[in-house]
Amino acid sequence: AKQMNTDILSKDKDPMGAAILDYQKSGKAGRLRVLSSMFEEDEMPVKHLFRKVEEMPMLEQKALKLAKGKVLDVGAGAGCHALALQKECSTKDASAKQENASEKQDISSVKAIDISPLSCEAMRLRGVKDAECINLFDDHLETGFDTILLLMNGTGIAGKIEHLPTLFNRLKALLNKGGQILIDSSDLKYIYENEDGSFDINLNGAYYGEVDYQMIYKDIKGDSFDWLYVDFPLLKSIAETCGLHGELVAEGEHYDYLARIF
């Protein structure tokens, strides 16, 4: 199996983390620029990373509703998903009124991880109780999760299609028996679609969902990184090669979808 990188980011190469921490501390941030060899320069609205549940896309809200047990939020960023789930944690407080308890989701704990030390600092400031700056592929990461969440294009972490089995096998190793992975992605095919409905895709080239990004914030330049978008049929078939089932939970408005892998 491919050896995945187990590093965390250094603070001087963590533009997104710097933007998140600025926004957390001052309520505003500069432009978080997103560059790619494949697309025009774009920017990521930092405020969006601090979205409340009601501001989240339907697919993310759906994923949060399906979470149960001991939860791991991978690539948690500013912690919006972890915070939302933390509120749902079944309180151990006996004085909590019983009628309230039935409405609560059965979530026992929430752990957020990110390779950005600055993002983890921001999450702790926001009240995420367990935010650890650790790489998903680091052996020191605890195991035994009932739900692993990978949202905002969770397949991205694999980087390339050939690494997706490595990602799935790693997640599988972190799951309890009966556990589930909730992951979202998009089919990028639409980018290559012509007016007549045909597609400009080189079938002998790299998989069309493989892209690269580089982020810049103020004078902080991140390293360029590979990011993977996967269509659902391919995600499902790769999950099956790893001895997992893939289920399409819901589709969004823009070729995006939420999948449950178990």
Model-identified regions with their sequence ranges:
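N-terminal auxiliary segments of SAM/dcSAM-dependent transferases
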Residues: K2-L35
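Conserved alpha-helix/loop element of class I SAM-dependent methyltransferases that forms part
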Residues: R51-K70
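Conserved SAM-binding loop of SAM-dependent methyltransferases across substrates and taxa
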Residues: A78-C89, S102-D106
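Conserved SAM/SAH-binding beta-strand->alpha-helix loop
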Residues: S116-P117
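Conserved SAM-binding strand-loop segment of SAM-dependent methyltransferases
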Residues: G127-D138
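A short SAM/SAH-binding and catalytic strip from SAM-dependent methyltransferases
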Residues: F145-P165
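A short glycine-rich, Lys/Arg-flanked "PGG" loop and its adjoining helix->strand segment in the class I
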Residues: L164-K177
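SAM-dependent methyltransferase
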Residues: K177-L234
